[in-house]
Regions:
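Active-site segment of metal-dependent pyrophosphate-handling enzymes
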Residues: 69-107
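Short helix-loop capping/hinge motifs at secondary-structure junctions, enriched
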Residues: 32-33, 107-111
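Short aromatic/basic micro-patch
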Residues: 44, 95, 118-119
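Acidic, metal-coordinating catalytic segment for phosphate/diphosphate chemistry
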Residues: 1-23
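NUDIX/MutT-family hydrolases
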Residues: 100-102, 109-140
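Conserved Nudix-box catalytic region and its N-terminal flanking loop in Nudix hydrolases
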Residues: 29-70
Length: 150
C-alpha cells in the first residue's frame, strides 16, 4: 500500500509551494459511508498540513479536533500520494504530499468552521476536489473490503 502516487500535472517554469499533510479516510460504524468536509470552496478529507516537528498521528489528532471537534482513532497507513494543483484561495501553485490513514471517530462535538458530511464512497470520490484524496478513499474501500480493521 505504500506505493508513491503523483496526481495533477507539474507545469514547467511554475514555482510550487510544497506542503506536507496528513489525512484520514473515516468510515461510519456500518462501514458504508465516508466522512468528508465541505468548506466554502471544496470538499476535502479531514486532516491537513503538518506543523514543525509534528508526527502524522499528532497532525491528524490536532486537525480532526480543530475541524470537526472530534477525537480520532488512527488506523492503518493507506499510502502516500502527491498532487499538483492551483489554490485559488491562496493564489499559488501547490505540491501537496499527503500521508493517508484509515480513521475512526471516538467522539464528536459541535462542528467548527467546516461542515462534516457522511456520504457513500462513490459520492465522496465524485465530490472531492483533490485527486490524491479520491485515490485514498478508493484505497480505504479496498482495505475495508479485505480486512477487519475497525
Amino acid at each position: 500500500l505504500d506505493e508513491k502516487r503523483v496526481f495533477g500535472t507539474k507545469k514547467p517554469g511554475v514555482q510550487y509551494t510544497s506542503t506536507l499533510s496528513t489525512y484520514a479516510v473515516i468510515f461510519n460504524l456500518k462501514k458504508d459511508q465516508v466522512g468528508i468536509l465541505r468548506t466554502d470552496e471544496h470538499y476535502v478529507l479531514p486532516g491537513g498540513e503538518m506543523v514543525q516537528n509534528e508526527s502524522d498521528i499528532e497532525c491528524l489528532q490536532r486537525k480532526i479536533k480543530e475541524e470537526i471537534g472530534a477525537n480520532i482513532e488512527v488506523g492503518c497507513h493507506l499510502g502516500n500520494a502527491a498532487d499538483y494543483y492551483y489554490s485559488p484561495r491562496d493564489s499559488q501553485y501547490v505540491r501537496n504530499e499527503g500521508d493517508f490513514y484509515l480513521g475512526k471517530l471516538s467522539r464528536q462535538e459541535e462542528h467548527h468552521n467546516h461542515m462534516f458530511e457522511w456520504m457513500s464512497p462513490n459520492e465522496a470520490i465524485e465530490k472531492l476536489w483533490l485527486d490524491h484524496q479520491k485515490w485514498a478513499v478508493q484505497e480505504g474501500v479496498n482495505v475495508m473490503q479485505t480486512s477487519s480493521l475497525f
